[in-house]
Amino acid sequence: MAQITAKLVKELRERTGAGVMDAKKALVEVDGDMDKAIQYLRDKGMAKAAKKADRVAAEGLTGVYVNGNVAAITEVNSETDFVSSNDKFVNLVKDATKTIAEGQPADMEAAKKLKMDDGSTLDQAFVNATATIGEKIVLRRFALEKKNDDQEFGAYQHNGGQIGVITVLEGADAATAKHLAMHIAAMKPKVISPEELDDQFITDQLAVMNHKIDQDNESRALVHKKPLPHLVYGSEKQLTDDVLAKAKEDIKAELKEEGKPEKIWDRIIPGKMQRFIDDNTQVDKHFAVLSQDYIMDDSKTVGEFLKEKGAKLVAFQRFEVGEGIEKKQEDFAAEVREQMK
């Protein structure tokens, strides 16, 4: 039987990232054969990963990497936020994002087959990480953005990588591209312009906003305040010429009822029309970046800011860790009882 030296154990750990006891056990099992020990750990890692496959991984980090005219953004999940601050996990996110930016895979299956710098596939790297770190580690999603030489990338990560953003701007400098990425990180838009918003999405969001108005009105009633009206429209897509014409006629009728002289209506109507438009484009302001108030200067919208700069937002990607994942609520006492069995 081969002697399992500390040097052998160290070498195996460096090549696989395995713990001391796992590395030693692997070498003992294969009588000191390094290649077989690596395969043993790999098989063991796949078995561990399979056992963890049904677990919910909703913590983690985003990764952002720019490689010339290609930028990649990823979300890598772990089960706990403690693991997401682990150096091995952080480095895996960086390496995986770099690999995707350089490999430019068409989909997740292609991404899993990409080779990392150490020669392992991306898929194997995540299997190994699950085995080594002891939690389910998964590449949840990625996106690629490309630009030409006349365009600029903006890349930004917020809150230690909990949010990642890539922007592609035309006619802008790097600072403007990054500032817009910071705005997008904070304001959570879904699309660039209102035209991209789905009609059903607008309807659904109006229902949510009107429900909030109902809740506010309950509080207002307690202090005898006038209730707020429901929103009828949510997007400029819905403000047709007929809708705007009717709004203008309603304003005229209101001014007449108030006894305002007709000769001053032309000075009042534009402001009231703008107020009508502002009140009835709330879905745009929440979800279309060009319609949002610019976070660096809320006296103007993002669209107005970019127009002043002579710039155009071509594309953006925003990832936030855990978006859309239902996190498992842990019963700590039950977990301890389970471990004591």
From Swiss-Prot:
Residues 80-83 are annotated as: Involved in Mg(2+) ion dislocation from EF-Tu. CDD domains: UBA_EF-Ts. This is Elongation factor Ts. Gene3D superfamilies: 1.10.286.20, DNA helicase RuvA subunit, C-terminal domain, Elongation factor Ts, dimerisation domain. The lineage of its organism: Bacteria, Bacillati, Bacillota, Bacilli, Lactobacillales. Keywords: Cytoplasm, Elongation factor, Protein biosynthesis. One of its GO terms (molecular function) is translation elongation factor activity. It holds the Pfam family EF_TS. NCBIfam families: tsf. The gene is tsf. Belongs to the EF-Ts family. It comes from the Bacteria. The keyword Protein biosynthesis applies. The keyword Plastid does not apply. Associates with the EF-Tu.GDP complex and induces the exchange of GDP to GTP. It remains bound to the aminoacyl-tRNA.EF-Tu.GTP complex up to the GTP hydrolysis stage on the ribosome. GO terms for cellular component: cytoplasm. It is found in: Cytoplasm.
